[in-house]
From Swiss-Prot:
Name of the protein in question: Taste receptor type 2 member 102
A GO MF label: G protein-coupled receptor activity
Anything else known: Several bitter taste receptors are expressed in a single taste receptor cell.
Membrane topology: Multi-pass membrane protein
Keyword hit for ATP-binding: no
Residues with attached carbohydrate: N161
Keyword Methyltransferase (UniProt): no
Length: 329
């Protein structure tokens, strides 16, 4: 077994690990917020954003997995209606995953940052309406993306040779469509997320200057909130940039028919919907407490320890308490 074969097998295993990890982390966010909704019959604004973001990312992860499977059997993938379903599902999941993450960045900015600008105070007062307006406005870009994708897909299908020998070109063409559409329609939301990140840094800088004037040595809750939000936002910006560049890598790899490079591109691409969701869990007090509770319960089960009914009820009550507790408002 040569070195390339070893790297290929290792990369394949890594893709499956990311696939499972991404489904578990996003599925946990969905389940946690669903239980919260069942208990309280309502969800806060940030919980709604996290819930829909996790659902869109689960779909995106499965789309990437379908693309990965097509490398081993291309002839069973890009055929007629299957191409349309996979392609347009990718467009939808990628669109909502990006815009929901952007609205999350805007949410953190307006809820945490301390600014005296009139426009900032106005947007902060109408935060819910702003988030809804951003998502409704994003539908205009989604419509334009779908219309352009339909025209490109019809043109592509019209001139396409359905023989198996051209399937590698089909995959390269499909990646090219996704890459350039993604580049065109992700500029605005990515810019908004970047601006939110920079403004939050500016707010943190002003806050730290204020703390120095009153000689506080320990980090106050506002500083901790700033740092937590910045970690979430910078991880999103970096991972989405890697996600975008991975499509470029995959496109170049398929042009040169390099399966190993294509798989490496997919590994990088899966990091965005998988790893960032884990960072969201660690940065959200409610989700973090619930996850620790579940891990503690799972560890006891795996060790084969005898859990009494009282102790089991105690764990269950604690989990319900964690779910019922709201995170950042």
């Amino acid at each position: 077994m040569n070195m390339e074969s070893v790297l290929h097998n290792f990369a394949t295993v890594l893709i499956y690990v990311e696939f499972i990890f991404g489904n578990l982390s996003n599925g946990f966010i969905v389940l946690s917020n669903f239980l919260d909704w069942v208990i309280k019959q309502k969800l806060s604004l940030i919980d709604k954003i996290l819930l829909t973001l996790a659902i869109s990312r689960i779909t995106l992860i499965w789309e990437i997995y379908a693309w990965f499977k097509s490398l081993y059997d291309p002839s069973s993938f890009l055929i007629g209606i299957e191409f349309q379903i996979i392609y347009f599902s990718w467009v939808l999941s990628s669109h909502f995953s990006l815009w929901l993450a952007t609205t999350l960045s805007v949410f953190y900015l307006l809820r945490i940052a301390n600014c005296s600008w009139q426009i900032f105070l106005y947007l902060k007062w109408r935060l819910k309406q702003l988030i809804v307006g951003m998502l409704l406005g994003s539908l205009v870009f989604l419509l334009g993306n779908l219309m352009q994708s339909m025209l490109e897909e019809r043109f592509y299908q019209y001139g396409r040779n359905t023989s198996v020998n051209t399937m590698s070109n089909d995959l390269a063409m499909w990646t090219e469509l996704i890459f350039f559409n993604m580049a065109m329609f992700s500029v605005i939301p990515f810019t908004l997320a970047l601006i939110s990140f920079l403004l939050l840094i500016f707010s943190l800088w002003k806050h730290l200057q204020k703390m120095q004037l009153i000689s506080r040595r320990h980090r106050d809750p506002s500083t901790k909130a700033h740092m937590n939000a910045l970690r979430i936002m910078v991880s999103f910006l970096l991972l989405y940039t890697m996600h975008f560049l991975s499509l470029l890598i995959s496109w170049i790899a398929q042009k040169h028919q390099s399966e190993l490079a294509d798989i490496i591109g997919m590994i990088t691409e899966l990091m965005y919907p998988s790893v960032h969701s884990c960072i969201l869990i660690l940065g959200n007090s409610k989700l973090k407490q619930t996850s620790l509770c579940m891990l503690r319960h799972l560890r006891c089960r795996l060790k084969g320890e005898n859990i009494t009914i009282a102790y089991s009820n105690q764990i269950t009550s604690f989990c319900v308490f964690c779910v019922a507790n709201k995170s950042m408002r």
